[in-house]
Amino acid sequence: MLHIAKAELNDLDALMVLFDQYQRWLAIRPPLSQTRAFTEQRLHEQDTCILTASYRSSMVGFVHLTPLYSLARARRGLIINDLYVQPDSRGQGIARALISHALKEARARQAACLLLQAHQSNHAAHHLFESFGFIYDVSQYYFLDVTD
């Protein structure tokens, strides 16, 4: 049975296994110690929300929600900043369950909106998001890495 829960500090080791897989998939490789320290800080400060999916006592996926502040709307929103399901667990409704719980979390926090982005080639993700009512926004996003 699938279980969705908010991540806690005692989930850190299992999360690191998933984060390592996720970062490899994205071809982003910060040191795992840096990822661990950053994640531990997020969990301790509770400034973001990580929801985990576990199946048969094994963590198989997560969704990471971060706050977004809109002066135009004078409300807070949330961004699905990261969503990952282990490859051998895909196609079983786990991402759908994670998004469903992310929507519940957004409503519980009285968020004005829930935003996300997906790679252009990830058609399965596009279809999934649209099935929830997400609409494609043609806004142009730019990215600049400002780290040294």
What is the role of each PLM region?
Residues 85, 91-104, 127, 131:
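Conserved acetyl-CoA-binding loop-helix of GNAT-fold acetyltransferases
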Residues 118, 147-148:
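N-terminal beta-strand motif that seeds the catalytic metal site of vicinal oxygen chelate
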Residues 107-117:
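Conserved GNAT acetyl-CoA-binding A-motif
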Residues 96, 120-138, 144:
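Conserved active-site alpha-helix within GNAT-family acetyltransferase domains
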Residues 68, 81, 86, 90, ...:
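Residue-level recognition of the GNAT/N-acetyltransferase active site
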Residues 2-3:
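Extreme N-terminal starter segment of soluble prokaryotic enzymes
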Residues 6-13, 17-75, 81, 100, ...:
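Acetyl-CoA-dependent GNAT
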